[in-house]
Amino acid sequence: MLKRAGLLAAALSLCAAPIAAHAEDCGTIQLGAAVSMTGIYAANGHNTRDGYDFAVKKINSEGGVTIDGKCYKFEVKYYDDESNPARAAQLVERLIDQDKIQFMLGPYGSPLTKAILPVTEKYKTPVVQAEAASRSLFTQGYKYHFGIIATSEKYLTPLIDMAAQLAKKDGKDPSKLKIAMIYQDDVFSMDVRQGVMDEVKKYNITPILDDRMPKDLNDITGFLTKVKALKADVLIVSGHEKGAATAARQMGDMRVQVPIIAVTHCESAKIVSDFPKASEGMICPTQWDETMKASDKTFGTAMDFNNEFKAAYPEYKVVPYNVAQAAAAIIVWRDAFNRAQSLDQEKVREALTRTDLKTFYGGIKIAPDGSNPGKDVVLRQIQGGQYKVVWPEDVAAAQLEYPRSAQY
């Protein structure tokens, strides 16, 4: 951690130099966050925190925000929610009630975000979250909740369209596609499932398998046995990091060959490094990729962000989209304070409702329900151990390798 902090400080030192002499004159805007440093969401919790910290230091190095002629620097106070929703809610209440923090960042994951939102609403505390995609979070009428990422029902809808188009090119009827699905029984994965179910109806497809993962996410061999016996055309797995790792490991053990295999949470599950043969050719949905045509004045292009983050955090061989979207949340806060020209919670909340900006992460335009409906998901394929955007075709950086044929 000390090495990481030192590298980041060095990377930003030149940018910070012009304002260093006046740093002591700046006020502080404290943001609060309960983020998973331990427990089942720890991998993406660390990604989230690193994204927040990187953006805070970058924005502070450029002068932070100026409100009514006075400069302010961002600071984030963290607690470890231990991947426990009840604990997350307790800690957010502590941040607001005891630590007197008036502006919040979200935790990682829909279950934890679902737990904290009643607290932030109770205290009328604005929260900008970048790591919870469940559609249900935006149907409760919350007025202080703002999410910037594509909602989870969108994660694999492009996959169904892709599979249908490929079937047509092969002279096949898309309605005959044999789709096998298995999901973790949690808010996020059930939203992913619903999005798929809605999309397959457009092509009159009835999935041949629609199973649930066991609670411990340790074994899906029974499901994979059925997949092989039924000769599925498309295989879908959504089970966060542990589910993705289990799927990759057991597909390798069982030599599963399916023309299209899609898995969520590929990066944080480290399936490329841990299961290089089994993961080859898998399709992975993502909210962001460094090849995307998106930019802003702070981070430059998506590729610029990718390169600068890797220089500061060299332990990252691939920059997960969780890092990028966490950093984008800090940009949203800066934009809101700049437009509100106030530290008043209600004035800042009102500014958040009018968010409409372009960032290295993509466009962020907040809708009345607090979501960012213009954000879409793209599909990447693991090719030669690298993630390559392959769908939609108009943004693809590489040709889709189809059908998938893993060399076990």
Question: Residue spans of the language-model regions?
Answer:
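Signal peptide-proximal N-terminal region
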Residues: 24-26, 50-76, 168-170, 174, ...
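Segments of small-molecule ligand-sensing domains
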Residues: 309-324, 330-390
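Short, low-complexity disordered leader/linker segments with a strong preference
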Residues: 1-30, 406-408
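Extracytoplasmic "Venus flytrap"
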Residues: 26-53, 79-85, 108-111, 182-191, ...
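Stable alpha-helical elements in mature extracytoplasmic
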Residues: 44, 48-55, 88-92, 100, ...
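Extracellular/periplasmic periplasmic-binding protein-like sensory domains
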Residues: 251-327, 338, 387, 393-408
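Beta-alpha junction/loop-to-helix N-cap segments that form part of ligand/metal-binding clefts
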Residues: 30, 43-50, 65-139, 148-151, ...
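Extracytoplasmic ligand/sensor domains, especially the bilobed periplasmic-binding protein
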Residues: 101-209, 259-284
